[in-house]
């Protein structure tokens, strides 16, 4: 199969179950809302080493937010519900509560359960906090130096999908990078997903475990390293490929992740120099979802 002349390998991305929460961060301006959203999703590339996977989902205009202010939805994920509950409290408390003019609301539809993030945060008010309501949502109003911080009492959690992915293989590192940036920009049009790595792009793709060091949970994916293609017998890097980047996608459900993979691949295939699109799978060691590339089209 080819898309815009680019080979799409007959393979699949291996994704896995994860618990997700979706939060709407609003502020007095779009700029301030994005700053708060960025801070809240920091250090969230991979649960291999980070306490959560996190990223910005989409911009929400004032007409569609509870407080009629600009906002961004963010997605925060962890395989453990208990750890995700902890991360919500830490991230909302340390990065949104502290951000100028910011507020936080639940933005997850069809939640399987709710956690008391806002209720726990109210105690920062030291007895001066109040209960309130914004567009039918129960909130806690916490007095702060600059005015008030408003946070919804409960945040939803549900089962989502993490690890949707594809590899962009190109003639040069530059063309691979441009294609990766185009893919990430296209994925931003899909609600309910995020790309957790820096700029949405993975430079150092990994494999499960290690061939040499038993203390590692993950190590470099040597089969996809362009500098090793002439050094190892089982290299999967084509002769005419000298640049590879990976895009990883987490989302609220399988269909959203698959939609994001499709639009990302289509965007990448428009860039001159892109030779092939592949995906990462690990023999079932990672997760139960098999997102076949050909099925996306």
UniProtKB/Swiss-Prot annotation:
Its main location: cytoplasm. It comes from the Archaea. Pathway: One-carbon metabolism; methanogenesis from CO(2); 5,10-methenyl-5,6,7,8-tetrahydromethanopterin from CO(2): step 2/3. Transmembrane segments: none annotated. Its EC number is 2.3.1.101. Gene3D superfamilies: 3.30.70.520. It is found in: Cytoplasm. GO terms for molecular function: formylmethanofuran-tetrahydromethanopterin N-formyltransferase activity. Keywords: Acyltransferase, Cytoplasm, Methanogenesis, One-carbon metabolism, Transferase. It catalyses: N-formylmethanofuran + 5,6,7,8-tetrahydromethanopterin + H(+) = N(5)-formyl-5,6,7,8-tetrahydromethanopterin + methanofuran. InterPro entries: ForMFR_H4MPT_ForTrfase, ForMFR_H4MPT_ForTrfase_C, ForMFR_H4MPT_ForTrfase_fd-like, ForMFR_H4MPT_ForTrfase_N. One of its GO terms (cellular component) is cytoplasm. SUPFAM superfamilies: Formylmethanofuran:tetrahydromethanopterin formyltransferase. One of its GO terms (biological process) is methanogenesis, from carbon dioxide. Pfam families: FTR, FTR_C. Catalyzes the reversible transfer of a formyl group from formylmethanofuran (formyl-MFR) to tetrahydromethanopterin (H(4)MPT) to produce 5-formyl tetrahydromethanopterin (5-formyl-H(4)MPT) and methanofuran (MFR). NCBIfam families: one_C_fhcD, PRK02114.1. Homotetramer. Belongs to the FTR family. This is Formylmethanofuran--tetrahydromethanopterin formyltransferase. It comes from Methanothermus fervidus (strain ATCC 43054 / DSM 2088 / JCM 10308 / V24 S). The gene is ftr.
